[in-house]
Amino acid sequence: MSEKVQKSEHEWQQQLTPEQYRVTREKGTERPFTGDYQVSDEQGIYHCVCCGAPLFENEHKFDAGCGWPSFDRPLADASIEEHLDTSHGMRRIEVTCRRCDSHLGHVFPDGPQDTTGLRYCINSVSLDFHPGE
């Protein structure tokens, strides 16, 4: 993975849409069933919308019925970081981009048991899909 991407909040605001900024830089969550990538079967790679790092592959995407794109694993363990998140009175594991620290979503232990058993529940707005990769 490349070296860390560091920008000022102003630079992020200039680069991202207001919704992308709210979710990725302020740890927000998009409304369920509203994201562009919630339903997509096209093969390709999902990159971080902030820094372009490759994060997830459509081959490992599945329909969890939760309203957000769900994957059973990242493209590479080195592409993400996981952090304990105790916000909103809950105890969850937050998933961030290792390269730029953008908030992507959360990982839960209720994914497909025939693969990893994990569900990476990711905000569509935090991703940029590159078909055919």
From Swiss-Prot:
One GO MF term attached to the UniProt entry: zinc ion binding
Assigned keywords, A-Z: Metal-binding, Oxidoreductase, Zinc
Domain of life according to the entry: Bacteria
Comp. bias regions, Basic and acidic residues: 1-12
Domain MsrB: 9-132
GO annotation terms (biological process): protein repair; response to oxidative stress
UniProt KW Chloroplast keyword: no
Region span, Disordered: 1-36
Family: Belongs to the MsrB Met sulfoxide reductase family.
Cited NCBIfam families: peptide-methionine (R)-S-oxide reductase MsrB
The name this protein goes by in its record: Peptide methionine sulfoxide reductase MsrB
Taxon lineage: Bacteria, Pseudomonadati, Pseudomonadota, Gammaproteobacteria, Oceanospirillales
Name of the coding gene: msrB
